[in-house]
Curated annotation (Swiss-Prot):
Organism field: Arabidopsis thaliana
Catalytic activity entry: Cleavage of hydrophobic, N-terminal signal or leader sequences from secreted and periplasmic proteins
Stretch forming the transit peptide: 1-52
Role: Cleaves the thylakoid-transfer domain from a chloroplast protein.
Protein name: Thylakoidal processing peptidase 1, chloroplastic
Cellular component GO terms held in the UniProt record: chloroplast thylakoid; chloroplast thylakoid membrane
InterPro entries in the cross-refs: LexA/Signal_pep-like_sf, Pept_S26A_signal_pept_1, Pept_S26A_signal_pept_1_CS, Pept_S26A_signal_pept_1_Ser-AS, Peptidase_S26
Length: 340
């Protein structure tokens, strides 16, 4: 009888200790006992008033569409925004802000993604004819490591990967986002696609054939006001020949140094003819992949290398077409240059 009374009393005392929460000891006891023995889970406040404003930043607007409800990706974007804020007091010598523990909370919250990403600098303005053809799959970059990675990932993983990559580079001087307003590079890049252009590689090497480059309007277009171009206009095209090459178009095919080029990224055979043209030193020859709907070197001649501002390396929009834009099949046939 005494043992039963003692056990009952001890149980009563334990319950009082748990329920009273007097002093720090009460909190400590509860934090240790409840999770282990009662499997109690705290509910975070899901009130919209407590959602951080960083959840609705420019990166989230840029990357995610209206339909996604993923708490994982939403929390990731929130953390990235919170760590790339404008509070100079949190920046260290490497330019990376300190991590905030409170930014983990959005991982447990749900919200609607914001529609209509902000407008980014357009490339290939003006002279290229826009043609709303039926959608076809891009034949470029299919063997890239980005494509291999994303092919086995879920939609959440794709969105998260895109968010991390673009948010890191978005404010960097090493890269710049660009928007495609025409179909001159179709089927590789379609109207409405958005790419990340890196600005580093050409400090260490020359532009190469098959590179997709973003460049300022060539000088010849600025000399004639009737073209309607200014120094602020930029284009996006693919390099098909480099300095010292001879370029020619005949029978719907491109010839470089009198060797026909087998290009699997071109939409269709060319409907125009072009006499042999020499590419001088310090220049490259650029064409759009949609050869018959592109305003390029076959119209205005070789492009000065100094006008190139970057190389397209990554398409981050739309999310369903996230991929690199680097051409991986380097089996483009090039013949010797004739010297006389």
């Amino acid at each position: 009888m005494a043992i039963r009374i003692t056990f009952t009393y001890s149980t009563h005392v334990a319950r009082n200790l748990v329920g009273t929460r007097v002093g720090p000891g009460g909190y400590c006891f509860e934090s240790l006992v409840r999770p282990r023995f009662f499997s109690h889970k705290r509910d975070f406040d899901r009130s919209p008033r407590n959602r951080p404003a960083s959840m609705y930043g420019s990166i989230a607007r840029e990357l995610i569409g209206e339909g996604s409800q993923s708490p994982l990706v939403m929390g990731l974007i929130s953390i990235l925004k919170s760590t790339t804020g404008h509070e100079s007091s949190t920046m260290n010598v490497l330019g990376v802000s300190s991590f905030k523990a409170s930014s983990i909370i959005p991982f447990l919250q749900g919200s609607k993604w914001i529609k209509n990403p902000p407008v980014i600098d357009d490339v290939d303005k003006g002279g290229t004819v826009c043609d709303d053809d039926d959608d076809k799959e891009s034949r470029n970059g299919g063997s890239g490591w980005v494509n291999k990675l994303l092919s086995v990932c879920s939609e959440d993983a794709k969105a998260a990967f895109t968010a991390v990559t673009v948010s890191i580079l978005f404010r960097s001087a090493l890269a710049e986002p660009k928007s495609i307003p025409s179909t001159s590079m179709y089927p590789t890049l379609d109207k409405g696609d958005r790419v990340m252009a890196e600005k580093v590689s050409y400090f260490f090497r020359k532009p190469e054939v098959s590179d997709i480059v973003i460049f300022k309007a060539p000088p010849i277009l600025l000399e004639y006001p009737e073209y309607g171009y200014s120094s602020n206009d930029v284009f996006i095209k693919r390099i098909v020949a480099s300095e010292g090459d001879w370029v020619e178009v005949r029978d719907g095919k491109l010839f470089v140094n009198d060797i026909v080029q087998e290009e699997d990224f071109v939409l269709e055979p060319m409907s125009y003819e072009m006499e042999p043209m020499f590419v001088p030193k310090g220049y490259v020859f650029v064409l759009g992949d949609n050869r018959n709907k592109s305003f390029d070197s076959h119209n205005w001649g070789p492009l000065p290398i100094e006008n190139i501002v970057g190389r397209s390396v990554f398409r981050y929009w739309p999310p369903s077409k996230v991929s690199d834009t680097i051409y991986h099949d380097q089996a483009i046939t090039r013949g010797p240059v004739a010297v006389s």
